[in-house]
Amino acid sequence: MLSDYKEKIKNKLSVVPFEPGCYLMKDRNDQVIYVGKAKRLRNRLRSYFTGAHDAKTTRLVGEIRNFEFIVTSSETESLLLELNLIKQYQPRYNILLKDDKSYPFIKITKEKHPKLIVTRTVKKGTGKYFGPYPNAYSAQETKKLLDRIYPFRKCDKMPDKLCLYYHIGQCMGPCVYDVDQQVYAQMTREISDFLNGEDKTILKNLEDRMMDASEKLDFERAKEYRDLIQHIHNLTKKQKIMSSDNTIRDVFGYNVSKGWMCIQVFFIRQGNLIQRDATMIPLQQQSEEEEFYTFIGQFYSLNQHILPKEVHVPKNLDKDMIQSVVDTKIVQPARGAKKEMVDLANHNAEVALENKFELIARDESRTIKAIEELGERMGIQTPIRIEAFDNSNIQGVDPVSAMVTFVDGKADKKGYRKYKIKTVDGPDDYKSMREVVRRRYTRVLNEGLPLPDLIIVDGGKGHMSGVLDVLENELGLDIPVAGLRKNDKHQTSELLYGPNAEVVPLKKNSQAFYLLHRIQDEVHRFAITFHRQTRQKTGLQSVLDTVDGIGSKRKTSLLRTFGSIKKMKEASVVDLKKAGLPEKVALNLQQALSND
C-alpha cells in the first residue's frame, strides 16, 4: 500500500508542467493539509520528495498521499489563488497566523441606534472600527471616556422604559424618544476625529460645556468637564510619537537567519506606535520574498486586522505583488522618517531572531552542562541517554509503570513507554519495577535498540538492587542505576548511587539537580496520567473504593464529614480518625489520596 501511493506521486510528478501555479497536498483521508505556490510547479513539487528537510516539512511530507495543482498565468495570480485556497481549506500546515492573535478595537455599530463597544472581532460592513489598541484596558478606558461625552445607547436589546444611563446623561433614550439620525452622524464624526488624532473638536466641546456650567454656578458639573479634559490630555500623551501626521498606517519589516524568518508589524495610530506584532516563520520551500507576500495577504484577509490608510514595506520587495493582495496604499519609503520606521521594524525583527537563537543556545548549553556535571558527580561517562521509571497504583489496584527518556538533557517523547503490570499481585513496588525493567531491556536487546547511559528509578536502595539484579544476572547488562528519593513534601531530595545507595553530593541550585527534578516530575506525571486513564477504563469510580477497610458505611460517613475527595486530601490522619477511621485505615487512605 505504501509503495502504491509513492508510485502514484512519482508518476504525477513527471507530468507536472514547468509553469507558475498553486498546489494542494492531501493526506490519506483526502483532506488538504498544505497549499503552496511556485514559479515552476514541477521543480517545487519535486523538491518535497527529494533531499533533507526541516522537522516541520518532514512531518508534512510523511503525511502526503496525493497532490493536485492549478496552473496560473502569473506569479501574482498564483499569490491571489493561494490566499483564496488557504481561506477555503484552512490547511493546518501553512496557516501562518493560526495562533489567531487578536487585538481590541473600538467599534461604532452600524444600526439605527448605534452602540459604542470594544471588540476583538472585525466584521466588514457591521460598523466603523478604530484601533487596534495595545490591550483591553486601554480600549475600555478610551470607551469609558467617550461614553461620558457621547450618549450612544448601551442596551443590547431595546427596553420598554428609560434606563439609568438616560438619567445620568449617557443615553438619549431611543427606547422612548425619537432620535434624529443627524445627531448620531455628528457624534460619529466627532468620535472618528478624536480616535484618529484630531482632539481639538472634542476639547473645544468640553471647554464650552465647562464654561457654561461655571456660568450657571454648577461647579460640580464644571469639575467633571475639567477632569474629562485632563483625562484626554493624559490619554493622548502616553504613546511615543513616531510620525508628525495622523495617517493610520502599518509598518512592516523582516529579517532572515538560520532558516527562520521574523516579520515585525508596527501599528501607527495618531502618529503613535500603539502596538507591535512579531511572527516567527520557519522558511521551507519558498523564498523569503514569497513568504512575505503570503504572510501579508493572510495578515489582512485571514486575521483580525483592519486595513490602514497606508502600508509601509521594505524597498527590496515587489510592490505590485503586495498590492495584488492588500487593497490599500503601499508605500516603500526611500528616505526620511518613514524609511527610519521601516528600518526600525527590520532591526526589531533581527533582534527578535537573535534573541530566539540565544535562548536556544543557552538552553542547549545548560542541558549539556547538566548531564556533564551529573556524570562527573556520579563518576560515570556523560549520560547522553537517560531512561527513568516510576510505578503507580492504589493499594495494588490497576498497577502500572511508566518510562520517560531524556536525550542530551531534554525530554524525548518518542522514547516514552507505558506498562501494565502483569505478573505482580498486590502493591509490590520492588517486584513491579523488576518486571518492567526486565520487559523493557529484553525488548531492547532483541530489537537492537539503543541502550541508556543511565537508568533512574523513583525510589531507594530496594528499587535499585532489584533493577541491578535483573540487568546483571538475568540480562547480562552493565548499566549504571541511580535512585531518586523525595522529601516529605514529595519533592526531589537526593540522588542515590553505588552498591550502598549513597547520596551523590549535588547542590540544590545546580543544573544537574534541576535536570533530575525535571526527570522525576516528568516520569511521575506520565505514570499518574496513565494510571488514571487505566482506572477510568476499568470503571474504578472512587479512590475510596480501593482502600482496604472502607466499605459503604465508612465511605458515606467520610463524604458526609468532608463533603468531597478534595477536602479529604487536605485532611490530616487525625482528621480522618475523627471521622471514624482506625489509624491504619486512615494512613492507607491518606497514601491512596496522595497518589490520586
Swiss-Prot record:
Its annotated compartments are: Cytoplasm
Give the UniProt record's GO annotations in the biological process aspect: nucleotide-excision repair; SOS response
Give the top-rank taxon of the lineage listed in the UniProt record for this protein. Bacteria
Q: What GO molecular function terms would the record report?
A: DNA binding; excinuclease ABC activity
Coiled-coil segments, which residues?
A: none
Question: Where's the UVR domain?
Answer: 200-235
Gene Ontology CC, one term: excinuclease repair complex
**Matching PROSITE patterns, A to Z?**
GIY_YIG (PS50164), UVR (PS50151), UVRC (PS50165)
Q: Which InterPro entries match?
A: GIY-YIG_endonuc, GIY-YIG_endonuc_sf, GIY-YIG_UvrC_Cho, RuvA_2-like, UVR_dom, UVR_dom_sf, UvrABC_protein_C, UvrC
Disulfide bonds listed in the record? none
Q: How does it assemble?
A: Interacts with UvrB in an incision complex.
Q: What does this protein do?
A: The UvrABC repair system catalyzes the recognition and processing of DNA lesions. UvrC both incises the 5' and 3' sides of the lesion. The N-terminal half is responsible for the 3' incision and the C-terminal half is responsible for the 5' incision.
What is the protein named? UvrABC system protein C
Q: Which organism is it from?
A: Staphylococcus haemolyticus (strain JCSC1435)
